[in-house]
Amino acid sequence: ISSYLRAFNSFLTWCRENGYSGLTVPNYKPKETVKETYSDSELSLLLKRPSASCSFVEYRSWVIVQFLLNSGCRASTIRNIQNRDIDLESRQVTFRHTKTGKIQVIPLCSTLSQNLRQYMRIRGGEASDYLFCTEHGEQLTENALRLSIARYNRSHGVQSTSLHKFRHTFARKYLIDCGGNAFTLQKLLGHSTLEMTKHYCAIFN
């Protein structure tokens, strides 16, 4: 919006220089909107380890929730991760499908690495297969991913089902609980500009 207004103001300047007057447009300053996050009590419910007799779908959803909370990645990114993108020895994941089109390499914490190792043992498949798949080994669609997490959240007593809310929660915890900085958060979130990241900092700091 700001870019459009700047261009329009340039047009108004031209109008004034050519004898037209009386038209002005105030500069647009977007309001800081609240980034909703999952509460600690909700996270405790969502991160509780499922029973050994749980279904593949529930176990997969549990690992997905952990992954979203520990990486801050977008839903469109997580559903495009392939088995080959997970390096458990180096404890890192490579995101090849990002909003900016740039490849990202993100560290994995030890707990998530251990749970991914167990999940991948159960999941099986080839290196080129998608990490988080359906029960038939196919790539999750965006809608299937959304519905799966919605069912998982509700079955664990959490009524909010937003996938992007996990990304906000990651940013909040990184900034507040870990004392992180905007520059590192920008790299972790894959923002193209620091201004986008500073929006999170202004809200959570």
Which residues fall in each region the model found?
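Conserved catalytic core of the tyrosine transesterase superfamily
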Residues: 1-205
